[in-house]
Amino acid sequence: LLVFALVNRPYILDLMPHKSVVQHFIKAGFDVFMVDWGTPTDADRHRTLEHYIERYMHNIVNHICDYTERDQISLLGYCMGGTMSAMYASFHQELIRNFILLAAPVDWFVRSSVLATWFAEKWFDVDKMIDVFGNAPPQWLQGSFAMLKPMSNYVEKYYGFYDKMTDEKFVEEFFAMETWVNDNIPVAGETFRQFVKDCFQRNLLVQGKMRLGTKRIDLKSITCPLLNLTASGDHLVPFGQSSPFNDLVGSTDRKSITFPAGHIGLSVGSKAQKELWPAVCQWLAERSN
């Protein structure tokens, strides 16, 4: 089961036939399922993290187990989807056979994280924003991510396109990426409020103090085989934000791979497609029936 973040659509994991994490798993013989969280409306503004994890994810996992006639699934979570998957796995370890994290943050007090600095309580009043807008606006989210690398996203990218605009393959890939990058969706207001407060501003997850409803999230409860994939050039989720996962879980079979790529290149980059994902599929196959 592939679980993506709430801020973008999940098809980045199946962007094009030759840039597809999904295709790698299918070719390796796995049944692949991917969560589409849909597009929150004003009616969803009160949806909490508990709704997404303990209701939606739990229903999805149970459905897959029923459909495949298996007692467990393997779980892959990307970015915020990885953090949410870790929360789920801590509550329902009995349903998770293997766990793969892909550029998933866990420690938000890392000094190299520009986004975490912007979201710090000193600078960002998340209550005021959600009280006014209801949900986190997609235009605001997209602009925030783009401004992490303004020259690259607003200038250099288009110079690069101009230089290669006669290259049909490059143009096709460029517009596929642009379509996805600009296909942002709102984040349900109460979910965004809790994630910003508990993770970005209080850093409760890494301290073992975060709760969903009445249940405390204990990452030590995760005991299945764990593969933690990080990107050395990730400007959105810096290495230091995601690398602590391996020391926080209770798994004895745990491995980390740091790949020379950025946050998105870790999934769709040409080098990652050729080198990383075949290795990931092999790791998973060795731990699956």
Named regions from a protein language model:
Residues 75-77, 102, 229:
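Short beta-strand immediately N-terminal to the catalytic nucleophile in serine-hydrolase-like folds
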Residues 1-41:
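Short, surface-exposed "cap/lid" segments of acyl-processing enzymes
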Residues 46-67:
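Alpha/beta-hydrolase active-site loop
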Residues 66, 70, 84-190:
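Alpha/beta-hydrolase-fold enzymes
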Residues 222, 228-230, 234:
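Short beta-strand/loop motif that positions the catalytic acidic residue
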Residues 224, 238-248:
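Short alpha-helix in the alpha/beta-hydrolase fold that links the catalytic acid
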Residues 76-81, 85:
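Gly/Ala-rich beta-loop-alpha elbow adjacent to hydrolase catalytic centers
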Residues 236-239, 256, 260-275:
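Catalytic histidine-centered segment of alpha/beta-hydrolase-like enzymes
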